[in-house]
Curated annotation (Swiss-Prot):
PANTHER family: ALANINE RACEMASE (PTHR30511), ALANINE RACEMASE, CATABOLIC-RELATED (PTHR30511:SF0). The active site is at residues 40, 263. It catalyses: L-alanine = D-alanine. It comes from the Bacteria. Catalyzes the interconversion of L-alanine and D-alanine. May also act on other amino acids. It comes from Listeria monocytogenes serotype 4a (strain HCC23). The gene is alr. HAMAP family: Ala_racemase. This is Alanine racemase.
């Protein structure tokens, strides 16, 4: 995708915030528990390569991604010897590519292991479906059979076993405890304990540090975002958001009563008012549902009016502003702030989606 360096819309990533979130999490982990930085989906919209570099500087011992291509991008960017685990499903025909690049793969079907052609040992993490209902084996019998199959092939290594919690970001823990018990039953059924046993995502690592096992997968909270609003007041330390989104007014005009703006003429001025056009739209991740939300101009709230367009958005100004004035979509401005959580609440979604939607057409600038 083309990145818009010649357009006054940009994202700022505070690397110091990422480092602080990692350090605070590491301070509460036992010394023998590694922290793996989850950098899938372009690091939740923050930029995979720069975030990976920042996380490694802060002490992360490895990385988790969703697809093999993300793992290969890290290798190509210079992360040659770092642990990398692909959490999602990988095609069988790509197993050799992963093996040659020393990339660990998630496996959850015995038939996937049959008739592999490998030029290097393949590191495998067995995924257990303890209650998420996505990928994973569900029985002791499946686990034992896969362990036997791996042991019979000297090109296969059972490096890890893991699961993913569906409700770790909730205060009620009964389902979480059921999942943990199911996972432990399968774990103890193995003849040999793998090198890495890991279960904790951000929420679990923050609220249930006792189940760290050998490593945690630190994702959303590395970026300073709360796993859910429900647990926000129960966190052991303050998270520092790393992402801010800015743009500038490219056209400022005064509307007369009866003037309408944007597609469908859904907004009509009822009095004389100032509006500004912003060079950002739903093609950038500022989806149409943002209509009716607000931004900050000079620290004051300014509503988004009319329909958000593919490349442009219109806001109602509290007064006349100069063309080129800075606009804050996510971030702080003169003592006021709009957070990813604020946007998520308005959009009836989660903060993960808000930042992941911000695509690579918006340039990232890395600070500190």
């Amino acid at each position: 995708m083309v990145t818009g360096w010649h357009r006054p819309t940009w994202i700022e990533i505070d690397r110091a915030a990422i480092r602080e979130n990692i350090k605070n999490e590491q301070n509460k982990l036992p010394e023998n528990v590694d922290l793996w930085a989850v950098v899938k989906a372009n690091a939740y919209g923050h930029g995979i390569i720069e975030v990976a570099r920042t996380a490694k500087e802060a002490g992360a011992k490895g990385f988790c991604v969703a697809i093999l291509d993300e793992a290969l991008a890290l290798r190509e960017a210079g992360f040659q010897d770092d642990f990398i685990l692909v959490l999602g499903a990988t095609r069988k025909e790509d197993a050799n590519l992963a093996a040659k690049n020393h990339i660990s793969l998630t496996v959850f079907r015995e038939d996937w292991l049959e008739d592999l052609t490998l030029e290097a040992p393949l590191r495998i993490h067995l995924k257990v479906d303890s209650g998420m209902g996505r990928l994973g084996i569900r029985t002791v019998e499946e686990a034992r059979q896969i362990e036997t199959t791996i042991a019979s092939d000297n090109q296969l290594q059972l490096e890890g076993i893991y699961t993913h919690f569906a409700t770790a970001d909730q205060l009620e823990t009964s389902y979480f405890e059921q999942q943990l018990a199911k996972f432990q039953t399968i774990l103890t059924s193995l003849k040999n304990r793998p090198t890495y046993v890991h279960t904790a995502n951000s929420a679990a690592s923050l609220l249930q540090p006792q189940i760290g096992f050998d490593a945690i997968r630190f994702g959303i909270s590395m970026y300073g975002l709360t796993p859910s609003t429900e647990i926000k007041t129960s966190l052991p330390f303050e998270l520092k958001p790393a992402l801010a989104l800015y743009t500038e007014m490219v056209h400022v005009k005064e509307l007369a009563p009866g003037d309408s703006v944007s597609y469908g003429a859904t907004y009509t001025a009822t009095e004389r008012e100032w509006v500004a056009t912003l060079p950002i739209g739903y093609a950038d991740g500022l989806i149409r549902h943002y209509s009716g939300f607000h931004v900050l101009v000079g620290g004051e709230l300014a509503p988004i009016i009319g329909r958000v367009c593919m490349d442009q958005t219109i806001i109602k100004l509290p007064r006349e502003f100069q063309t080129g004035s800075k606009v804050t979509i996510i971030g702080e401005d003169n003592g006021n702030a709009i957070t990813a959580d604020d946007a998520a609440q308005y959009l009836d979604t989660i903060n993960y989606e808000v930042t992941c939607l911000l695509n690579e057409r918006i340039p990232r600038k890395y600070l500190h």
